[in-house]
């Protein structure tokens, strides 16, 4: 089967529209979701900039299936929204700000994602001059998700592709950091 014609499904109800991978990658955020930005309490110029950037989002190239836990979603990421993630010591310090007294053994994927998702929302907020809470809302509104790359960056990518584990189960930053911090492993980034 041609990868482009696969219709992602399952995994928490992704892709209710029944779009093919090729269609999702060419237009990651469908027009009916982009129109929802008009209903948000945002300055018109912010909505206009977001729509212009979302119009540039996407690629005719469908990401290759995960290989050895690695995926490359960069071609379908929100243009211009990226941030570096902290190295091990910086991550531990940030987690301990959220969870004072936490032992290294008690650090989990969730406590790591609390930091990475904040960084991702902040990157979007900074780009458009909106609040971090509003940035998080918009990511969900547009059916996108924060993806941590295995080279320690965040990207905002289509949920329909990111959660399509049959092709894209991956281990990235969260898995790498968890193993460095306490030796634990996760089977997939979303666990």
Language-model regions, residue ranges each:
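Nuclease and nuclease-like effector domains acting on nucleic acids or nucleotide cofactors
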Residues: 2-145, 149-191
């Amino acid at each position: 089967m041609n990868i482009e014609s696969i219709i992602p499904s399952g995994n928490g109800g992704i892709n209710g529209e029944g779009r093919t991978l090729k269609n999702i990658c060419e237009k990651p955020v469908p027009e009916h979701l982009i129109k929802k930005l008009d209903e948000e309490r945002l300055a018109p110029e912010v909505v206009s900039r977001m729509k212009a950037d979302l119009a540039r989002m996407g690629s005719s190239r469908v990401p290759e299936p995960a290989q050895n836990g690695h995926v490359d979603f960069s071609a379908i990421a929100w243009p211009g929204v990226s941030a570096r993630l902290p190295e091990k010591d910086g991550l531990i310090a940030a987690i301990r700000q959220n969870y004072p007294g936490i032992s290294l053994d008690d650090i989990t994927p969730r406590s790591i994602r609390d930091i990475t998702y904040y960084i991702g929302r902040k990157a979007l907020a900074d780009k458009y001059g909106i609040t971090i809470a509003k940035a998080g809302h918009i990511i969900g509104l547009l059916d996108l998700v924060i993806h941590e790359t295995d080279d320690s960056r965040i990207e905002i990518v289509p949920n329909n592709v990111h959660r399509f584990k049959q092709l894209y189960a991956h281990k990235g930053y969260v898995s790498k950091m968890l193993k460095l911090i306490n030796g634990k492993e996760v089977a997939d980034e979303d666990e």
